[in-house]
Each structure stands twice: as C-alpha cells, then as structure tokens.
C-alpha cells in the first residue's frame, strides 16, 4: 500500500452506521457504512448477549467494514455496536445497536454461505483501481495477480448469478477490469504474473528475471475472461463493450510466440523483454498447465497446431520423462500416462500418485473435464481418482498428523508455518498442513467427502479458520498454526467448483465459446 500522510485529528470521528447483521449456523456477520478517513486507525466492535451490557470483542482494520463473530453455537442471539478509533486512540461514540442470531442451516445454505464469503475476497477485497484480485489479503495492497484475477473473474460471475451483487454492479466492475487490462503491460499479448493495480506496470515480485510475460498466469486469466465474454450476452452498450474488449484482448495473445522457436515441441512459461528466454521453463504435463496448451490450440489468431498437446503437454521425449521423474521423485507417471493403482484407485494419468489437488482445479474451472478425453483418459474420471487417492491417503494418515481423516483431507498448495509449498499425498511432501481449498474445490469429484470437510472445517475449526472472506488459507493442527492470510489462488476455485458441482455454470459458459468448441474438435480429430 502506498504511504500517505496520516492526520491524527480525530474530532471528526463518528459512529458508523451498521447496515446489516446476519446470522448463519455458527457465526454472525455485521457490516457497516463509514466514509474513508485518514485519521482512522481501526474499528472497534462490541457485543452484548442481553441487549444492554456491551463488551469489546475485536477490531477491524480501517479498510474493512465488516466483522465476523464466530459464536460457535446454534440459536445464540447477540447485539452489536461499532465505533471508530483514531491514531491517537481516541474513540467515537458507539453506533446504534443491531441484533441477529445464529440458526440451523441446510447443506444448500452452507454452500451459499461459503460461496458468498469467498466471493467477497474478489469483490470487497479487490484492488480498487483495477478491480482485480490481490495475491493475498493482507498483503501488498496495490499488487494484483493475473491468475488469481482469472479465478476471481469466474467467482464474480457466480456472485452475480447468485444475487450476491446485482448484474448492473457486475457490469460496472467488468468495465473497470477490461479497461485496466487494455492499458496494462503486455508482452506479445500476454500479461505478467504480478502487476501494479494503479499503473498496470509489471511487479517483479519473483526477481528481475521475471519481468515480462507469464503464459500460465495469462491462461488462468483468459479462462475467466472467455467465460465472462459468454456471460455478458445482453444487448446494452455496456455489455457489448465488455464482449468487444475481451474479444480484442483474446485475439492479441501471441500463443505461438511462446514456442521459443518454430520447431519447438513445447510452449514456454516466461518471456522477458530484455532477457528473453532466460528462465527457460518448458510446459510439460501432468500439472496445472493443461489450460495453456488448450487455449493456445483454441486461439483464432496466434494458435499452435493441435499436435502440440501430445508433443508438448503429454510429451514422450526424454527431457519430458526426466522432468516428470525429477519433480515427482519417482518413475511413476514419468511417461505422462501412469496406469498404477494407489489405495485401491487406478490412476490413468499423473506423476507419482497424482500430485497436489490444484492440478485438478486450475485448468478445469472453465474447461469441463467431462468433455476432455485424450489418448490416455477422460479427465473427469482421472481428476476424480486423484481426489479419491488424496482422500484415502489422508484417511490412512501415515504421518500421524492431528485432524487427518474422512472429513479433513485435500493436500494441495498453500502457505504453511514455514514456507509456501505444494503438498501432495506422499510422506515427503506432507507436513500436516491442510488447505480448505483442497477438499472444497473438489466438490464436483467428491461431493460427499467434500461436504464432510466443509462441515468439519466450519463447525469444529471455525473459531480460528473462518473469517470475513470465508476459510483462511491453511492450518496445521500438529504445529498449532493457522494462516493469517486469505490467498487469491485458493479462495476462487472453491466458489467456482462448488458452482460447477451445483449447476455447471462456469463450465457451460466457457465451453460455449466458439473458439473453445473449435479447439476441442481439433484435438478430438487427432486422438
């Protein structure tokens, strides 16, 4: 966040207006209106259980006009008041009191609750100049992430469709987003991993070599944009403008440039305007990058031959074999196809025993795995089996980690108590850290196991795991640790994949795009 002069004058502090208090099964959300003030340090929240005697229970940062009170029981009534506190620690008068109560909720209502809370990460928590997603909250306030923004675009479509915000509000947000994307830095049509929200300039967060295009992050972004292009199908000038902007941006991505040279069998992850291919990272599956090859094949202007799916993504070359064996630490799946059985589940495709669960999420938020079948497998079946292997590994709990079981599972990438790590169902990639997105973004594959995890995380761990933007990024009961962050790459897949499980909305939108249809037909022709 940019530094600014802070006024210590607090004479203008005033009681906020609480516009809503809403009870859920185990918590109550309150939100209020108050103008921005330089001298404001935080909001102070008070609660009463009798409507008369109020005690302070917490604070909310000056930019957050919402507070989640996790009560932990059903049928509890509470009253709330809020004040403003300045940098000199003087306090405004308290707001008028509002009341709400926790209540029993159906499974459908619990899904609504999770989707709406995690949607707010991208709506209330968006970087204001661009309307796009921050890498994490709290974090670097002006820095946005292209991939997380693509996930947020799809989550926002869900939010509009479910009435969390109006369509008119959604149109306004997407006009801001597409306007920003038109003026942001691009490199042969592709975006950087990180950008500055106010200026659109590259943020070299991962170092000076990563100062240009990131083709994988661009793919996640365009997976969302193509779904949005299909969603905003109205006759208004505003919706037509959204469509035309997305069409133009889509056609300007030079996917074929990222082959590095004309006879390359691979696409490459990065390109730098002054260091060119210095990172030199070819895209080889099985991992999260299938969508990159798919979009490159689908492009109507700068596409690659459909055969690159097999020469690059599913390559049988020695380099690809060594790449897979190296990161997987095994020969299993090093030829792309696997064929082994783990915990009683046969795995057609995947390195080791399937890898982290985000491999089954990121490429398949818009791309419907039911409708993707290659020479080796159908990807809904394969993704479901990867999720089931992950679930059974966690039930077996070889490491003896606290909490693991039928309703606590889903090893994937997240922060942990020590670093950021992509965890998977292997002892050497497991340290007891669980990210809620693992199980919850797997709803289409494992609805019963995912619902069990949702209820466990909310009902039993919600006092430390649930907050204003839904579930926090990760927790480790053995290490007595919970992440202080919400992460843009992990909040969105939960919203989107729950919706795909419930209605297939985002799958249907993305798959309806004419270029998507044409690209998949071209792939089917060489299967």
Describe the role of every protein-language-model region.
Residues 2-7, 85-104:
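Extracellular fibronectin type III
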Residues 10-19:
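Proline-enriched interdomain boundary motifs that mark the N-terminal boundary
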Residues 20-24:
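Short, solvent-exposed loop/linker segments at the N-terminal edge
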Residues 26-39:
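Conserved aromatic anchor
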Residues 37-56:
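Extracellular low-complexity, O-glycosylation-prone stalks/linkers
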Residues 63-68:
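Short S/T/G- and acidic-enriched coil/turn segments that sit immediately N-terminal to beta-strands
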Residues 69-90:
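Beta-strand-rich modules
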Residues 99-527:
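Ser/Thr/Asn(+Pro)-rich, low-complexity disordered segments
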């Amino acid at each position: 966040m940019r530094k600014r002069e802070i006024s210590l004058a607090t004479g203008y502090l005033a009681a906020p207006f609480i516009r809503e208090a809403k009870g859920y099964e185990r918590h109550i959300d309150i939100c209020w209106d108050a103008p921005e003030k330089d001298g404001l340090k935080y909001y102070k929240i008070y609660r009463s259980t009798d409507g008369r005697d109020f005690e302070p229970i917490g604070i909310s940062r000056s930019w957050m006009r919402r507070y989640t009170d996790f009560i932990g029981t059903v049928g509890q009534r509470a009253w709330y008041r809020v004040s403003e506190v300045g940098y000199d620690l003087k306090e405004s008068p308290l707001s008028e009191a509002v009341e709400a109560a926790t209540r029993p909720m159906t499974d459908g209502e619990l899904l609504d609750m999770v989707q709406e809370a995690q949607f707010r990460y991208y709506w209330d928590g968006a970087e204001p100049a661009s309307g796009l997603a921050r890498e994490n909250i709290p974090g670097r306030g002006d820095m946005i992430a292209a991939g997380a923004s693509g996930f947020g675009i799809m989550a926002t479509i869900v939010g509009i469709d479910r009435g969390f915000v109006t369509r008119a509000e959604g149109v306004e947000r997407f006009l801001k987003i597409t306007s920003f994307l038109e003026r942001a830095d691009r490199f042969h049509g592709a975006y950087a991993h990180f950008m500055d929200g106010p200026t659109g300039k590259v943020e070299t967060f991962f170092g000076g070599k990563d100062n240009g295009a990131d083709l994988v992050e661009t793919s996640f972004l365009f997976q969302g944009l193509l779904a949005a292009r299909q969603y905003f199908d109205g006759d208004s000038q505003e919706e037509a403008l959204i469509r035309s902007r997305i069409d133009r941006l889509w056609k300007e991505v030079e996917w074929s440039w990222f082959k590095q040279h004309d006879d390359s069998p691979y696409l490459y992850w990065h390109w730098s305007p002054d260091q060119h291919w210095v990172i030199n990272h070819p895209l080889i599956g099985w991992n999260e990058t299938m969508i990159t090859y798919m979009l490159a094949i689908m492009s109507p202007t700068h596409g690659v031959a459909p055969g690159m799916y097999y020469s690059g993504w599913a390559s049988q070359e020695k380099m690809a074999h060594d790449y897979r064996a190296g990161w997987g630490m095994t020969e299993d799946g090093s030829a792309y196809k696997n064929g082994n059985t783990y915990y009683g589940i046969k795995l057609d495709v995947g390195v080791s025993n399937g890898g982290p669960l985000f491999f089954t999420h990121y490429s398949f938020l818009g791309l419907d795995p039911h409708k993707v079948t290659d020479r080796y497998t159908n990807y809904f079946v394969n993704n479901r089996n990867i999720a089931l292997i992950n679930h059974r590994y966690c039930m077996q709990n070889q490491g003896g980690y606290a909490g693991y079981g039928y309703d606590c599972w889903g090893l994937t990438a997240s922060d942990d108590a020590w670093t950021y790590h992509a965890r998977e169902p292997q002892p050497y990639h497991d340290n007891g850290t669980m990210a809620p997105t693992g199980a919850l973004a797997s709803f289409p594959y494992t609805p019963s196991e995912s619902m069990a995890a949702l209820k466990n995380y909310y009902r039993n761990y919600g006092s430390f795991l649930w907050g204003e933007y839904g579930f926090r990024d990760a927790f480790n009961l053995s290490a007595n640790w919970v992440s202080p962050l919400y992460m843009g790459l992990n909040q969105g897949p939960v919203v989107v994949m729950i919706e795909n499980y419930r209605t297939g909305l985002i799958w249907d939108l993305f798959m309806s795009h004419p270029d998507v249809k044409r690209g998949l037909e071209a792939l089917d022709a060489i299967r």
